[in-house]
Regions:
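Flexible, glycine-rich loop/tail regions that form catalytic "lids" or insertion modules at the edges
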Residues: 1-172, 183-187, 191-192, 247-248, ...
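Iron-sulfur-associated redox domains of electron-transfer enzymes in respiratory
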Residues: 488-492, 506-507, 519, 541, ...
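Active-site pocket-lining/capping segments in soluble small-molecule metabolic enzymes
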Residues: 531-534, 541, 545-560, 609-629, ...
Length: 714
């Protein structure tokens, strides 16, 4: 049959005759007028730290920036500073039910090939069906975009103005989104095979306010889909807004076929003596970043990712979702078009100021007057002060002795001060919006669960010996063993000399690389944890650079010093719930007395996965929040991957109850826990056990410099 079909038409001749390759265009020249460039950047929401923290490494090193210690800023809807629309969309990822792809080691299966033009029906057997333009990637320069308007190419392009008059006020945004959809439908019906959604008018006309590019592309795509016209044209986003891979991935995911990030290319051109090389490196970094986002869902071809809408909205109301992101999970509601328009108007005013300047809002690192950070210097100092009470004692007393001295010396009063800083902060997490109400009169203290039983519900988050020093790693194990909780050794094994002592971690983790997993390791665990995903980079693997692989780490991981160690994104023996059940069974054979837990990360649909985990006979389902800490992760993953644990925990609880599975497991949660109130809210949402990561590190003296990934912590 295959041979008959191959010979039925001159397919290769049709492709050779009709499919034409085009390039991305000539590089952009550095801006001649710096003041005008800054004004344009301010109009589109650029910040100083966006240029230095995100764009500079992309343009100079050709790769996305790496960061550490997780995201402790509020969700975009709760932020003190205005955020781009893309910050309201969280990246989704595969866990258990299908495998993510390793975008670094499996690059040969990835493709950013882009086709522009009208797509004929899938089973069309006509030469014209091959009449499209082919790009190697999804980025265009202004020169390349202009070349697509050549009538000889036959695309009949139509430019749609993605701006609105400033005099129309906030209501102008809604009207502009509706207008874009109507103009797109009319243009496609008139034969336009290329739609250019452009906010370039904002560069030329002071009264033009740019429509946020995601809203412009999303509104256009949704209208085309409703009219059945989406495959009859291609969409190019000509915009000054996107800088990082998350914004680019969102534009592609909501319907853009190609992107012309003209303002970012111009900014990149100023970061190197060779402007063309800087732009090439930026485009390479952007492509790698989009590959990473695609790979999280196991998607290898960009054509399969376009328009797939693999995001969830956190903080957008129903009108915005219905108009621009229809079908996207949005469990919370939030701000609407009027609020987003007000932010756009504020940016426009900043760009029109007599002397425009870029702000430094502190999205990535804490700065006075900037975005709120949950782990800010005041909170850190209060916590350090609390746990160090009694540290001036003479002699070598430590551990429990210092704890006793702290309590006797008023340590609890100091804790209450620390807790008040956290509990009375501006809303920085979804749980801060929840108020507890008494269920009845107070219960006598002697009827409350004993402190020892409560402590047994606490654990530390998984932190490996590769991310912590041996001293810090052992301190956590000793502390949790003494108070009756469980420490988690993370992936990478543990020194056998610690087994059977108070230095032994109760929870031994089994990750995708299986580093350090030996029969003795498994046998010396109270709990064995299968790590499916990590809150700071869900859907991604891990890599320990060779210079960090010391002789000690190499010994524990059964490898060679100086050789980089790779944990792939998926467990290559877990591509389904049935595969997970097999690993759970195997671990219980290795250690019949140990509980087996499975670590997931919050996202829409995690409840269904959790139900499968329980059916695989795991004893504990663990839900990690997106704000979890890390020793090193891509910055875009830290800021935009996964969802808050409050959403994941609530969905998991409801799914397990609905399927009569809740009594068969314990549910544990972690991600940014700092005080007893966090524990209380999590318990009310369904959790049995609670994990502390960053707070535990701070308690033992971490200074939160956020340079773990650079291996130069002071």
């Amino acid at each position: 049959i295959k041979g008959e079909l191959a010979a039925s038409r001159p397919w290769s001749a049709w492709v050779a005759e009709h499919l034409r390759s085009v390039d991305a265009g000539r590089p952009v020249e550095p801006p001649a007028d710096d003041r005008r460039a800054v004004a344009a950047q301010a109009t589109f929401g650029f910040t100083r730290e966006l240029l230095t923290t995100v764009l500079r490494p992309m343009a100079t090193a050709g790769k996305e920036p790496t960061a550490s210690m997780g995201d402790d800023t509020p969700p975009a809807v709760l932020g003190l500073t205005a955020r781009p629309v893309g910050h309201f969309l969280r990246q989704r990822f595969a866990q258990v039910t299908n495998p993510p792809i390793d975008h670094l080691r499996e690059r040969h299966v990835l493709s950013s090939r882009t086709l522009l033009g009208c797509r004929h029906p899938l089973l069309s057997e006509e030469p014209e069906a091959a009449g499209m333009l082919e790009l190697d990637g999804f980025t265009l320069t202004p020169d390349g975009l202009e070349a697509l308007k050549d009538p000889a190419l036959g695309l009949c392009p139509k430019v749609l103005d993605a701006t609105w008059p400033v005099d129309d006020g906030p209501g102008g945004l809604r009207a502009a989104c509706v207008r874009l959809g109507e103009e797109a439908v009319a243009a496609v019906r008139d034969g336009a095979c290329l739609l250019v959604i452009s906010d370039a008018a904002a560069d030329e006309r002071s009264e033009a306010v740019p429509v946020p590019s995601l809203l412009a592309v999303g509104a256009t795509q949704q209208r085309l889909l409703r009219e059945g016209l989406a495959t009859r044209t291609s969409v190019v986003a000509d915009t000054g807004e996107p800088v990082d891979s998350h914004q680019a991935a969102a534009l592609l995911g909501y319907g853009a076929d190609a992107i012309c990030p003209r303002l970012t290319l111009a900014a990149a051109a100023t970061l190197d003596q060779d402007p063309a090389a800087a732009q090439d490196r930026y485009r390479d970094a952007l492509t790698e970043g989009v590959f990473k986002v695609m790979s999280k869902m196991g998607i290898s071809v960009l054509d399969a990712y376009r328009g797939a809408q693999i995001f969830e909205a956190v903080g957008l109301d129903g009108e915005v979702v219905d108009l621009c992101f229809a079908g996207t999970p949005s469990p919370l509601g939030g701000i609407g078009l009027d609020e987003l328009a007000a932010d756009a108007l504020d940016r426009h005013r900043a760009g029109q100021a007599e002397v425009a300047r870029l702000e430094n809002p502190g999205w990535f690192k804490h700065r006075p007057g900037g975005e709120y950070h949950a782990t800010n210097p005041e909170v850190m100092q209060a916590l350090h002060f609390t746990v160090r009470e009694g540290a001036e004692m003479k002699g070598s007393k430590r551990g429990a002795h210092l704890l006793q001295q702290a309590v006797k010396g008023g340590g609890f009063e100091r804790y209450k001060h620390y807790a008040s800083l956290v509990n009375e902060r501006p809303p920085a997490a979804l749980r801060d919006l929840l108020a507890t109400s008494p269920a009845g009169p107070p219960v006598p203290l002697d009827e409350v669960e004993p402190a020892a039983d409560i402590m047994a519900r606490f654990s530390t988050a998984a932190m490996s010996l590769g991310s912590l020093s041996p001293e810090a790693h052992e301190t956590l194990a000793i502390a949790l063993n003494r108070v009756g909780g469980r420490s988690n050794c993370g992936e990478g094994g543990e020194d056998p000399a610690r087994f059977g002592t108070e230095r032994s971690s109760a929870i031994k983790q089994v990750a995708s690389g299986r580093f350090g997993v030996t029969p003795a390791y498994l046998a010396n665990a109270v709990e064995l944890q299968i790590k499916i995903a990590q809150g700071s980079k869900p859907g991604e693997g891990g890599q320990l650079p060779g210079h960090k692989v010391s002789a000690e780490i190499a010994r524990l991981r059964h490898t060679q010093p100086g050789v980089a160690l790779i944990s792939p994104p998926p467990h290559h023996d877990i591509y389904s719930i049935e595969d997970l059940a097999q690993l759970v069974f195997d671990l219980k054979q290795a250690n019949p007395t140990a509980e087996v837990s499975v670590k997931l990360v919050a996202e829409a649909g995690v409840g269904t996965v959790a139900a499968g985990v329980v059916k695989s006979l795991a004893d504990v389902v663990m839900i990690s929040g997106a704000d979890g800490g890390t020793g090193a992760s891509p910055l875009s993953s830290i800021k935009h991957g996964g969802a808050p644990w409050e959403l994941g925990l609530a969905e998991t609880q409801q799914a397990l109850v609905a399927n009569n599975l809740r009594s068969r497991c314990k549910v544990r949660v972690d991600g940014g826990f700092k005080t007893g109130r966090d524990v209380l809210v999590a318990a009310l949402l369904g959790a049995d056990e609670f994990g502390f990561g960053t707070a535990a590190l701070l308690a033992e003296g971490c200074l939160m410099v956020r340079t773990c990934h650079q291996d130069n912590c002071p």
